[in-house]
């Protein structure tokens, strides 16, 4: 069984037992969280698509860790004007493990 959930403004296809990194969620390590924005649920060749959410569908997950992604370097330059600007960014994430999908 798999589901498509929305969290942090992004959509993820998840299945039970999977680990994934999502946008930072304010929860403690080891805490069980509920992802209730389920867009679709599928099993085998059956697919249930919500309008926009599947009624009664819930994905339960456990928070494993918090961290930061690798640095993304931004470099701006104006040719012939001796203008250069360096900038960096590291995005925070939360690593979760999908425990159960109920639909």
Swiss-Prot record:
GO MF, one example: structural constituent of ribosome
Cystines in this chain: none
Keywords from the named record: Ribonucleoprotein, Ribosomal protein, RNA-binding, rRNA-binding
InterPro entries xref list: bL21-like, bL21-like_sf, Ribosomal_bL21, Ribosomal_bL21_CS
One Pfam family here: Ribosomal_L21p
HAMAP family in the cross-refs: Ribosomal_bL21
NCBIfam families: L21
Subunit structure: Part of the 50S ribosomal subunit. Contacts protein L20.
Family label: Belongs to the bacterial ribosomal protein bL21 family.
Function: This protein binds to 23S rRNA in the presence of protein L20.
The protein's name in its UniProt record: Large ribosomal subunit protein bL21
